[in-house]
Amino acid sequence: MRLELLVVLLVGLAALAPSGSTCCKTEPPRCETEPPRCETEPPRCETEPPRCETEPPRCETTTPKCETTPPTCRTEPPTCKTEPPTCRTEPPTCKTKPPTCRTEPPTCRTEPPTCKTKPPTCKTEPPTCKTEPPTCRTEPPTCKTEPPTCRTEPPTCKTEPPTCKTEPPTCKTEPPCEKHCTKRIKRHRTKRTKRSKSTKKIVHHHNRPGTTPESGCGCGSKNESGGGGSGCILKDLLTPKCPDSKPKPQASPKCKSDPKPKAASKTTSKPKPKACDSGKKNTTKKPRKTQPQKGGC
């Protein structure tokens, strides 16, 4: 762009010059100036990272080998021979216990060997281990056994006649008036019966031996005062009566479930056994509805 402007200025100056002057043909200078070619290549900075190869120092420290042999201390066991004591005692006329001869055991004291080994001093390259020889001192055992002294005094036998005082025992055993044996019988559960009414508690009453229902200890229920009501007639007929029977003090009545009153309650009519029933039954139970029979009956 600058070269073109210079050429235009030179042409303009030549045109303005006076034409009547000498004929000087001045050709315009040809300035062929090529623009400089600046080829600047980017610098190639190839810097390799420094390779620092530092080997770790090899520190080889050999451990000193200190071989210390353990001291061999042999202590022979003491041989203490003690003859058994000969105690001869004449057999006495009375039976006496055999004499007790106490022989004290021999006291053999063996002191433990004192083996003192100093710790080895190991110096590097080469190790010098100095171990002093062990000094084992074993004193001979001193066994002192005194002869046993057996003293047997003549036995004194005193036998007094035994005094046996045996008083006749006073046995006062009154059997209880009445015992109730409870036994649970599971009913067959149906849709109508509830879970709480599936088990029925049956109370069995037992008479005192030798008593009758009239005396007050009958087969009445817990709620009844004296028992022996009209419902006990069937029970008295079923239980066997012993003529002129007296109460035995040593035997108490046992509670066993008698199957006879249960069988009698099924065969008898409904209003009679209600007197002997326990008071725990639900009296407000609604009667079941009887379905009408099909047919003319």
UniProtKB/Swiss-Prot annotation:
One of its GO terms (molecular function) is bioadhesive activity. Salivary gland. Keywords: Repeat, Secreted, Signal. The keyword Transferase does not apply. Changing residue 106 to A: In strain: Berkeley. Changing residue 159 to A: In strain: Berkeley. Residues 59-84, 141-174 have a biased composition (Low complexity). Residues 26-84, 141-218, 243-297 are annotated as: Disordered. Residues 181-208, 282-291 have a biased composition (Basic residues). Sequence repeats lie at residues 26-32, 33-39, 40-46, 47-53, 54-60, 61-67, 68-74, 75-81, 82-88, 89-95, 96-102, 103-109, 110-116, 117-123, 124-130, 131-137, 138-144, 145-151, 152-158, 159-165, 166-172, 173-179. It is found in: Secreted. Residues 1-21 form the signal peptide. It comes from the Eukaryota. Residues 26-179 are annotated as: 22 X 7 AA approximate tandem repeats of T-[ETK]-[PT]-P-[RKT]-C-[ERK]. GO terms for biological process: puparial adhesion. Changing residue 247 to S: In strain: Berkeley and Oregon-R(2/10). GO terms for cellular component: extracellular region. Residues 27-58 have a biased composition (Basic and acidic residues). This is Salivary glue protein Sgs-4. It comes from Drosophila melanogaster (Fruit fly).
